A protein has these predicted regions:
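Specific transmembrane alpha-helical segments of multi-pass solute transporters/efflux pumps
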Residues: 1-33, 38, 74, 155-173
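Hydrophobic alpha-helical transmembrane segments of multi-pass integral membrane proteins
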Residues: 6, 10, 60-67, 86-93, ...
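Glycine-/small-residue-enriched transmembrane alpha-helix faces in small-molecule transporters
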Residues: 10-13, 17, 21, 70, ...
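Hydrophobic/small/kink-forming positions within alpha-helical transmembrane segments
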Residues: 12, 16-20, 43-48, 73, ...
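Specific alpha-helical transmembrane segments that line the substrate/conduction pathway
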Residues: 23-55, 94, 175-194
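Hydrophobic/aromatic residues within transmembrane alpha-helices
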Residues: 25, 51-57, 108, 117, ...
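Hydrophobic transmembrane alpha-helices of multi-pass small-molecule transport proteins
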Residues: 57-77, 129, 204-223
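C-terminal-most transmembrane helix of multi-pass membrane proteins
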Residues: 147-149, 182-233
Length: 233
């Protein structure tokens, strides 16, 4: 029980802090493209932080990271990066916190039951989010009623289901690979906008999606297969 409580507190606090930093950053500067790119920088930070924990990635993994970052840039940054603003630092801190959350899940998920860890994590997030809302905002019942569906979807699907699957999936997965797979959210976001909201995808954005998907596939290809391809060529 103590280990489960500790795991839930650590993972939940990191998830709350990362989400709060992201939402505050977007509120200050509502550029979703830049927010998506900076937040997804955990794809690089996770293996970098992993070096300090004795996890040495091979060349295949690092090449995949570079390809993924290039793909994210093409997909998200349509008009260049622009100047660094205060909100950017918040979004970068969000990426750092999400990196720590992925590493924490990697550490705790093999030690405790995944579903119980998920419940503990979201209990902590709920308590800390409610406390922050009461301290820094003045929410009303009318606001909750008006935004009930988005709140329920974000709480149940985007948070509850998605992060439970993350915990279960990371039990036997390198956290660097997990971060690569999770950065596919940028791809699905773009594709969802195209399919459901009829938003146009430029050739640059499509190429960015292809690069990110290729990076995820490359990172998970067995080394033996790569050696065979190299010899055949």
């Amino acid at each position: 029980k103590k280990k489960l409580l500790a795991a839930g507190f650590v993972c939940g606090t990191l998830l709350f802090a990362a989400s709060a930093a992201q939402q505050i950053g977007i509120t200050i500067n509502p550029s979703t493209a830049k927010a998506g790119f900076l937040t997804a920088m955990y794809v690089v930070l996770v293996p970098v932080f992993g070096l300090f924990l004795g996890r040495k990635g091979n060349a295949q993994l690092w090449i995949s990271m570079v390809v993924a970052v290039l793909g994210l840039y093409l997909l998200c940054m349509k008009n260049g990066f622009g100047s660094i603003e205060s909100s950017d630092w918040l979004l970068l801190s969000c990426a750092v916190l999400f990196s720590f959350q992925i590493i924490a899940v990697d550490h705790f998920s093999p030690q405790v039951d995944g579903v119980r860890l998920s419940l503990a994590e979201f209990l902590v997030v709920s308590v800390e989010s409610t406390a922050a809302a009461l301290l820094f905002e003045t929410p009303s019942a009318a606001q909750f009623a008006e935004n009930a569906l988005p709140i329920l979807y974000c709480g149940i699907m985007s948070s509850g289901v998605a992060y439970t699957l993350q915990i279960l999936g990371q039990r036997d997965l390198n956290p660097a690979i997990a971060s690569l797979i999770m950065c596919l959210e940028s791809v699905f976001s773009a594709l969802g906008g195209w399919m459901l909201l009829h938003q146009n995808l430029s050739a640059r954005e499509v190429f960015g999606c292809v690069l990110i998907f290729a990076a995820v596939v490359l990172a998970q290809l067995p080394l033996e297969m790569l050696h065979r391809v190299k010899k055949a060529s």
